[in-house]
């Protein structure tokens, strides 16, 4: 079997004597990030200590303007258009226009989260999909759900290496396996870093040469720590073949409201892909929730109070992520500097010998299990994102350290020095103590 293709795992019978299962193969395991979130909740309910650093939830309360907008539309009980209501699509189009990308409202499709739109796009495009290694957990799983192969291509900061991508696509097609799309994450989850414009341009060149549709997941684009740093989207280089997705779960911390939007490609491909995506949407989610669409239209119109909220969120995420990165680095891990969102991606390989001798750790799963079992620190092994488990990498999320109440979270949001707040400082001290003992 091609090692770059994610296989489907068989479902075992529930009992040894039960005979063959009537179910088919498992196309996707339970999401590791959502499983980690439920595990953390279960530990809390049992009264066990938890330092929640596994789940990438933005960890801040909804802005009052958005709560009011949601409540005011509670009577919107009809289904509405599959693509989303016109005010939302017009607001989303204006969001991209303010970023230098003129967009027609007809090029926008809304869905119940960008996650659903990503799956819908894979199903609409068909064929195999090239995915960066490492990358967000759900890309490969969604490809499997759509009955497609996910071809894992080495890369960094959410963008597959251009040369490796070209070779992977050529080899797959030569063996009769079509590859029709490539997914990039800008900025990246799990690494919390941002790809260079040259890397994005090189990927676009390969996509043009091999006729690949680019799906650019830009859910973290508004949470770049340095807003002045150059940011390159594939749509700037290949607008006729790039779909851009985003949503409100990260920049405005509305993960539970489930609202995302896709900007379809310019040129002839956009209307064709729109028709196919709406076909998928009509059979799966019908339409996004009406009240949420009303609040989202306000969000994408970007009134000053909401842009200020995003600015403060970006500052908070950056300061806490950098503080955690410094602690991990001081403990001996190799840590890329966080550039966006609320993720840190330490590599404990420099400590592999000591970890093996002291704790019997030989994989990233071992390390993550030890941290939660012995110290109550919940993180994810990088192998959940496609890495080899022998590399002792972890994905550390920092956004649930901001407090247990809305009052604490708002204090963190407005603080010039959030890491000095007692509840955040206590979490950082707990991390320091575990790292010291780990060595």
Predicted regions and their residues:
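N-terminal small-domain helix-loop-helix segment of the aminotransferase-like
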Residues: 11-112, 120, 302-303, 402-405, ...
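Hydrophobic residues in well-ordered beta-strands that form the structural core
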Residues: 131, 152, 214-216, 296, ...
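Conserved glycine-rich beta-strand-loop-beta hairpin in the small C-terminal domain of fold type I
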Residues: 314-325, 335-354
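Active-site phosphate-binding strand-loop segment of PLP-dependent enzymes
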Residues: 157-230
